[in-house]
Amino acid sequence: MNRLAQKTSNKTITMKHFADNGKLKLLIIVGTRPEIIRLAAVINKCRTYFDTLLAHTGQNYDYNLNGVFFKDLKLADPDIYMEAVGDDLGATMGNIIDKSYKVMVETKPDAVLVLGDTNSCLSVIGAKRLHIPIFHMEAGNRCKDECLPEETNRRIVDIISDVNMAYSEHARRYLADTGLPKERTYVTGSPMAEVLHQNLADIEASDIHQRLGLEKGKYILLSAHREENIDTEKNFSSLFTAINKMAEKYDMPILYSCHPRSRKRLEQSGFQLDRRVIQHEPLGFHDYNCLQMNAFAVVSDSGTLPEESSIFTSVGHP
């Protein structure tokens, strides 16, 4: 398939040409691994019914953070790479809006689909100005913590979306309280159950325990990467002091799948982790979920892991 390179400032947007097949054109925009994971089943189903383009903002593009998930979840590579990461947060957010706007002008989608509350979702600002219908999955989530960057993104995207798809009745009520029309709000549930069930055989077949020398049920799985925990000194110190105490109390390995930013912060701080806390590079979808299914406990500040862990109970894993 021919490829087109379109210059935008000093960055490049790379996209595929699509033939006109008579189908409505849907543009799906992602930028982080939680979006890729949650949307995996949706993306594949959308390709059946729509002329679907998948755009990646580049917000978190690294093989271990993103690329491996396309492989594990049997997803085709993104059709569009925006390379929107800037020198700082402001530049990145500006690039996401600017580059996604240019993509929409070029590809002329009939609708745009985003999920969640990451900075990638801010791409819908351009869609609104271009009068392109916006569909927002995972709408209506609220934590009532105004210090959380995602809380601001949620409010922006919910308000300007044409159709909001909430995971729960609780989230729908938040949308209703905001004054959003009920006829454009739907409770769809989360797509995570389908994603996990579709990949269950591969998850169970993973040999990650053998590779890492871990015994099932006798380790703790740790994920800690959120900005408010890693970049705030007080929270950072409290968190990892608690992790060390946990390692001492339970006397078992704590496997820490460590985000590059978290690893850098630990190195800079000089904080000494307990010898039982094992840092490891980010793992793929099948390996990580196999570890999650068989852990003594999962400790996380992630939004995805608690949801995955709760779903595992439906397939016989407490």
Identify the residue ranges that each predicted region occupies.
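Donor-nucleotide binding loops and adjacent catalytic segments primarily
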Residues: 59, 67, 204-294
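A nucleotide-sugar donor-handling region in carbohydrate enzymes
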Residues: 10-13, 59-64, 83, 160-235
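Active-site and donor-binding regions of nucleotide-sugar-utilizing enzymes
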Residues: 25-30, 35-42, 49, 69, ...
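N-terminal subdomain of nucleotide-sugar transferases
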Residues: 4, 10-59
